[in-house]
Amino acid sequence: MNGNHKQALSGVTLAAIGVVYGDIGTSPLYTLRECLSGQFGFGVEPASILGFLSLIFWLLILVVSVKYLSFVMRADNAGEGGILTLMSLATRNTPAKWTPLLIILGLIGGSFFYGEVVITPAMSVMSAIEGLNIAAPSLDPYIVPLSVLVLTLLFAIQKHGTATVGKLFAPIMLTWFITLAVLGLNSIFQHPEVLGALNPVWALRFFAKYQTASFFALGAVVLAITGVEALYADMGHFGKSPIRRAWFMVVLPSLVLNYFGQGALLLAHPEAITNPFFLLAPKWALLPLLLLATLATVIASQAVISGVFSLTRQAVRLGYLSPIRIVHTSEQESGQIYIPVINWMLYISVVIVIMSFEHSSNLAAAYGIAVTGTMVLTSILSCSVARHSWHWNKYLVAALFVALLAIDVPLFAANLAKIFSGGWLPLTLGAVMFTVMTSWKSERFQLIRRLNEHGNSLEPMIASLEKSPPTRVAGTAVYMSRVVNVIPHALLHNLKHNKVLHERIILLTLRVEEVPYVHNVRRVCIEQLSPTFWRVVASYGWRETPNVEEIFHRCNAEGLSCRMMETSFFMAHESLIMKERPWYLYLRGKLFMLLQRNALRAPDQFEIPPNRVIELGSQVDI
């Protein structure tokens, strides 16, 4: 490996530290405090301290290091990861009868992420600012307003992109992880007996001693691995090797040292349970640590916000959400996007959550259900990929499946116990998003099928028009066509009402494939159907934005002359009329009509000049 490559790789590794590990890296702020807060019925005593530390350590090893970094990250779609990507991979080679179930599981996983994303910024930022209690107890009433202020500033700058401030993320997070390690080491040196918790026997003793209470305590232990999905979701931005290297070289050692440092502090001073993280620091370091913690939690929140933007774009491109406005904030990086409606809906939700729960300890009850639910679904989908795409031995996959669920299911079940104390929040948000996605996909499919049922077959219609041509006018007309073998409705309406056709007709179909990018050589496929009709099929990946001007440029390069200002774009606009339905389908139809009315119009989706667009309306029963 040459020097330049090593330097580039280390730079990407540093960048991964700054983005990927923000959420899991700020978990020491609250995890051990919530584990030992007394809610499970046992006090701050050596058996519980060492038991929790052992559970946290082995969760970091088994879930993060083994499951995600060694197994799940093998499943990539042209380098991209994430739950919807995993869903796409799982449905490729699986028997058709299982496909609907796998799609539903993938959509539930995506919906869980929307539930989690509301809680993460609130939980992280509040936990950091609660350090004011230690530095200046009189400032306690200002924790909620300060948390809202910090997050207001964060959401307000989203429209400007994070390319500039993003350069600071990596050094800040590296400083954060070094600080975690130093604080923990200092405490461990004073009480090295805490290292005994590395032995999994302490976890087993914990279960044996506390029995039922220890099961429910898993709901707090899981806070140590919140954000683990980011490792897989951000794989496309940084690559597998930098993410793995960052974990094993920096993040894992720092987290373990800090957790064990907090444990050592609690062994000597049980009263430090009020906030063991900040009490690790000497008094002179409290304010700098508070500032650093706030910056780290803001960065963690930024990573989650960027993640929900990326997930939303993928869902829109794959047809699970209605088209919405997506703004690219960087000319160099396609991943730098801003979605106004998602940004402000998320901001309002986060502020409501902060003002309702008022303290991170109250919010901790809501945290974990979405994370562990996604973990279960990830295990199911990744094992499906291992069996049907990688063709692993079925007995090996079965053993792996059982081993993964033996960890994931108890964690999820323990978190279900928190439904009435806050766990309802992510479940409700997830249920809303699942309803929206399935309603849009199902109703859109039915609408297109209904339109095509009454459509005319392409070839016979073109032959008829060439044989008995209507009046022709100069110029080029482009008709957007959803299906390549059916005449577009806009063309039929134009013939019906205007009785004319342009001298050149292009039937344009835009396809989004289940890959992040489509190679330029496959971008456009041109077929001449008759002397005056052409069919153009343009293919895009879900990370790309369809652009008609680019399509025209490629058509020109392949011999089909297209000029934007000499072309008219004809598009169909459907007015939907609801037929009689059962009440639950009626509600779904009403939701679809609401989404359709507020969806981004096709000219805006495909960057077509508005003065070149002609929309022809029709009524459609649904």
From Swiss-Prot:
Q: Provide the topology term for how it sits in the membrane.
A: Multi-pass membrane protein
Q: Name one GO cellular component term.
A: plasma membrane
Q: Which UniProt keywords apply?
A: Cell inner membrane, Cell membrane, Ion transport, Membrane, Potassium, Potassium transport, Symport, Transmembrane, Transmembrane helix, Transport
Instruction: Give the catalysed reaction(s), semicolon-separated.
Output: K(+)(in) + H(+)(in) = K(+)(out) + H(+)(out)
Q: Which GO terms describe its molecular function?
A: potassium ion transmembrane transporter activity; symporter activity
**Has the keyword Transmembrane helix been applied to this entry?**
yes
- What is the role of the protein in this entry? Transport of potassium into the cell. Likely operates as a K(+):H(+) symporter.
**PANTHER family per UniProt:** LOW AFFINITY POTASSIUM TRANSPORT SYSTEM PROTEIN KUP, OSMOTIC STRESS POTASSIUM TRANSPORTER
Give the protein name, as stated in the record: Probable potassium transport system protein Kup 2
